[in-house]
Amino acid sequence: MASDFLPVRRALLSVSDKTGLIDLARALVARNVELLSTGGTAKAIREAGLPVKDVAELTGFPEMMDGRVKTLHPLVHGGLLGRAGIDEAVMAEHGIAPIDLLVLNLYPFESVTVKTDCTLADAVENIDIGGPAMLRSAAKNFARVAVATDPAQYADLLAELEANNGQLSAAKRFALSVAAFNRVAQYDAAISNYLSAVADSAETVPTRNPFPAQINSNFVKVMDLRYGENPHQSGAFYRDLYPVPGTLATFQQLQGKELSYNNLADADAAWECVRQFDAPACVIVKHANPCGVAVGAGCGDAYELAYATDPTSAFGGILAFNKTLDAATAKAILDRQFVEVLIAPDYDAGALDYATKKANVRVLKIPHGNGLNNYDTKRIGSGLLMQSADNRGMSLGELSVVTQRAPSEAELGDLLFAWRVAKYVKSNAIVYAKDSRTIGVGAGQMSRVVSAKIAALKAEEAKLTVVGSVMASDAFFPFRDGIDAAASAGIQAVIQPGGSMRDGEVIAAADEHGIAMVFTGVRHFRH
């Protein structure tokens, strides 16, 4: 069994990232810790005026093959793997001295291979061999050895040494061991993912298959959740190892109760929808569906218009804004309705002050970022569905007018607005909109015509006028009945992908009703 506290007398430092190296080395030397090192790390320590012994001097074997072979030696690995109370005699027989602390980070394979001009040779030269081997040796022997893999760990490491007269606890050694094995797993996964995606080893800058023969995913736990989608399910939230800037996983919670599984799922839907707009916008989401979306002169205006779409569904909803939330809008929201989560790229001081009056409201800040997820995944029984993310936009120039009447300029603007919203509504999705605000949303129905009828019903419940509005459909109309239902509600223009066997009948129906219709040639199913 591991002793609780063990002293650090000898440390091996070998790092690619020199952040914090000299401060760490200086603190260790001040505690009379003997330093061993390699290559550029030893050079940096020596130039700082600190004593250090080269590993080559220890092993009696020089670094060779342009640094490919440096630490793969029994005097190094024996010093890391030797067990207290078991291996002392063998170590003494072979002149192996124990190493108590390993500080090591790996060649920057991930940051090199993310570059678009990375050659296969560049990638291969940044595959670390000796580093992972040492990490595994040290991490396996956490009963005696401590291992640090990240400059972010140095401060806590030194603090524990300071607090315990140069010793590290068993708990600290074990925690560092787990982190080291995680780092090795992440590193090996990155190498496997890269090489599995390389289509042709003969290419200088190889083409990468977006769907390689094997994928290895790494996620880091952010938090445990109160429960999963339902109270009888347990749950936790994990983020990508390298989250895309501007996506939900980069959030900072400023106040409120702990987040639930459903909070996060709904927050992601709301945030992804609102961040596609340039002008001030508000999106209100319930059960992963937008129930109100609007663009306005400011956050307050956008909120009022979005809320008016469906005040009933907005109760207990998730509200997302794409601009800094001001105090007046925060007050209007919190005085009017129960809110589960507020999301914005930032908040002014007054908004945050007022939010504290509703201490349970979860307030999330997500920094601006233009990054987009490259892939969507969905778990099925013992399998994973993977696809490129639906990041397809739409511009006026891509629309095809298929009816006798072309949409007016105002209708075109509303059509594109409704199309953007429909992309985030569960299929079958129908969105009625006018003046850059939703009038009614029909979501998740097995029949497209029923979704159209629901959109009209929601508008009627909210006492909003459908006449003169436009309609967006996430997929084509298989029959003319959807157009007939829209016409009876007062819809004047329609945007849809087209592509049905009965497009001719659908277009004829639109012409009969004097409806302008455009095809996008793009479908936005969402399940």
Curated annotation (Swiss-Prot):
Enzyme Commission number: 2.1.2.3, 3.5.4.10
UniProt keyword Ligase present: no
GO cellular component, one term: cytosol
GO biological process: one example: 'de novo' IMP biosynthetic process
Database matches in SMART domains: AICARFT_IMPCHas, MGS
Segments forming a coiled coil: none
Substrates-to-products reaction catalysed: (6R)-10-formyltetrahydrofolate + 5-amino-1-(5-phospho-beta-D-ribosyl)imidazole-4-carboxamide = 5-formamido-1-(5-phospho-D-ribosyl)imidazole-4-carboxamide + (6S)-5,6,7,8-tetrahydrofolate; IMP + H2O = 5-formamido-1-(5-phospho-D-ribosyl)imidazole-4-carboxamide
PROSITE patterns linked: MGS (PS51855)
HAMAP family, per database record: PurH (MF_00139)
PANTHER family: BIFUNCTIONAL PURINE BIOSYNTHESIS PROTEIN ATIC, BIFUNCTIONAL PURINE BIOSYNTHESIS PROTEIN PURH
Entry remark concerning the domains of this protein: The IMP cyclohydrolase activity resides in the N-terminal region.
Family the UniProt entry places it in: Belongs to the PurH family.
Name assigned to this protein: Bifunctional purine biosynthesis protein PurH
Species of the source: Xanthomonas oryzae pv. oryzae (strain KACC10331 / KXO85)
